[in-house]
Amino acid sequence: MAQIRIHEVNTRIENEVEVSKFLQEEGVLYEKWNISKLPTHLNENYSLTDENKAEILAIFSKEIADVSARRGYKAHDVISLSSSTPNLDELLINFQKEHHHTDDEVRFIVSGHGIFAIEGKDGKFFDVELEPGDLISVPENARHYFTLQDDRQVVAIRIFVTTEGWVPIY
């Protein structure tokens, strides 16, 4: 279950109902998908082959199709980041630049952890700390950035409005 940390006051929201309510009020789509159907050989595997990535997409194809039909998404892929990722530190520096997009930024966490820092409607930032099974859609034009948690590894399905993917506006 995702958790929220509000930057300015350094408070946390950990209760499932309160997390969902907070995100809904901020216009952030949050869903919990069944991660238990992921086979053992893909669980916590951060060195994925193209075949592994295709298998992950097939496993969650119904969920991807459902959210895509509801929200108009047209493309998806799988990304894996870990200590074995070339230039991981450089990538993270780039990811941590505050930006927005003219479309939603959608991620489903398959393994590992990630954090979206999002500017709230009140202009203050909050973190959404994500774990396996969490799907988040950062709304279009919301200022945000993405980073990893202390384990510095994540496998995520990215879902896009267009086949070109997201274009960051800094």
Swiss-Prot record:
Pfam families linked: ARD
Enzyme class: oxidoreductase
The enzyme's E.C. designation: 1.13.11.54, 1.13.11.53
Keyword Coiled coil appears in the UniProt entry: no
GO MF annotation list: acireductone dioxygenase (Ni2+-requiring) activity; acireductone dioxygenase [iron(II)-requiring] activity; iron ion binding; nickel cation binding
Matches recorded under InterPro entries: ARD (IPR004313), ARD_bac (IPR023956), RmlC-like_jellyroll (IPR014710), RmlC_Cupin_sf (IPR011051)
Positions of Fe(2+) binding: 99, 101, 105, 144
Gene3D superfamilies in the record: Jelly Rolls
GO BP, one annotated term: methionine metabolic process
Site feature location: May play a role in metal incorporation in vivo: 98
Superkingdom classification of source: Bacteria
Residues the UniProt record annotates as site (Important to generate the dianion): 107
Keywords of the record: Amino-acid biosynthesis, Dioxygenase, Iron, Metal-binding, Methionine biosynthesis, Nickel, Oxidoreductase
Metabolic or biological pathway: Amino-acid biosynthesis; L-methionine biosynthesis via salvage pathway; L-methionine from S-methyl-5-thio-alpha-D-ribose 1-phosphate: step 5/6
Chain residues that bind Ni(2+): 99, 101, 105, 144
Cofactor(s), by name: Fe(2+); Ni(2+)
Cofactor note: Binds 1 Fe(2+) cation per monomer.
May play a role in transmitting local conformational changes (site feature) positions: 104
Catalytic activity: 1,2-dihydroxy-5-(methylsulfanyl)pent-1-en-3-one + O2 = 3-(methylsulfanyl)propanoate + CO + formate + 2 H(+); 1,2-dihydroxy-5-(methylsulfanyl)pent-1-en-3-one + O2 = 4-methylsulfanyl-2-oxobutanoate + formate + 2 H(+)
Function: Catalyzes 2 different reactions between oxygen and the acireductone 1,2-dihydroxy-3-keto-5-methylthiopentene (DHK-MTPene) depending upon the metal bound in the active site. Fe-containing acireductone dioxygenase (Fe-ARD) produces formate and 2-keto-4-methylthiobutyrate (KMTB), the alpha-ketoacid precursor of methionine in the methionine recycle pathway. Ni-containing acireductone dioxygenase (Ni-ARD) produces methylthiopropionate, carbon monoxide and formate, and does not lie on the methionine recycle pathway.
Family: Belongs to the acireductone dioxygenase (ARD) family.
Assembly and oligomerization: Monomer.
Name under which the protein is recorded: Acireductone dioxygenase
Organism in which the protein naturally occurs: Bacillus cereus (strain ATCC 14579 / DSM 31 / CCUG 7414 / JCM 2152 / NBRC 15305 / NCIMB 9373 / NCTC 2599 / NRRL B-3711)
Encoding gene per record: mtnD
